[in-house]
């Protein structure tokens, strides 16, 4: 059997520990979101234009869970077994899932604002159009670092068992791409979430939705933005690996907060799991 050298800064225990964290987080998020997806498909009462955003958020998170499980598998092997092309596919698929998920957070916030404040009804034509635009833009922006285009580069994380945007490049292409993505997919969604939920504070007297986004993606984004100005390789490889692992826990928070914590969605999940309508779903 071939022997592979461990990545610099990582021991066998580190590889096992990070792999286990990715495995546990990936499996938990996968099953939580899978139940959410199947419940939407099986329970007719759940199939509303509003819930369609939550359904698509779960689909995007399933993609990120699968991405993390692939990284967990490679971590247990101690090397990346899928070659250069596999790295590009892994980076692209993960980026599509991330960008789509964050976009659907903004779409759900916008929908709830109109649901509670303007009392405007959501139509399938509107929900479907927004969903197509979100997925289309996610694919478009995620494709930019692919070799055929070359705006940014997908490469290995420090542990060499998963692929993402290479933040160690620090060149003009990386800087312009990172700034663009940060503005479009972090700053803008944060503004939408903050303004929408502030307007309906009487109904949502909690800030968990906003805090979850910052907790999962804030540290990783700070490092990527910092890499636009300084070389980040001085940061410990373990810390640089910890940040994307933390970001990959976002599907768990999304499932709990947006599906299982949603009064318009959890009743359908309960009905799917038990065969009985919940009290709030009967109202």
Identify what each model region corresponds to.
Residues 26-29, 56-68, 130-142, 182-190, ...:
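Alpha-helical transmembrane segments of multi-pass membrane proteins
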Residues 215-225, 241-283:
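Seventh transmembrane helix
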Residues 11-20, 49-108, 114-122:
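Extracellular TM2-ECL1-early TM3 structural module of rhodopsin-like
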Residues 225-239:
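Extracellular/periplasmic helix-loop-helix junctions in multi-pass membrane proteins
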Residues 1-31:
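Extracellular N-terminal segment of 7TM GPCRs
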Residues 30-41, 65-69, 96-119, 131-132, ...:
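Cytoplasm-facing ends of alpha-helical transmembrane segments in multi-pass membrane proteins
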Residues 104-116, 145-157, 179-227, 257-259:
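Class A (rhodopsin-like) GPCR signature focused on the TM5-ICL3 interface and adjacent 7TM helical core
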Residues 2-7, 79-95, 127-131, 140-187:
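Loop architecture of class A 7-transmembrane GPCRs
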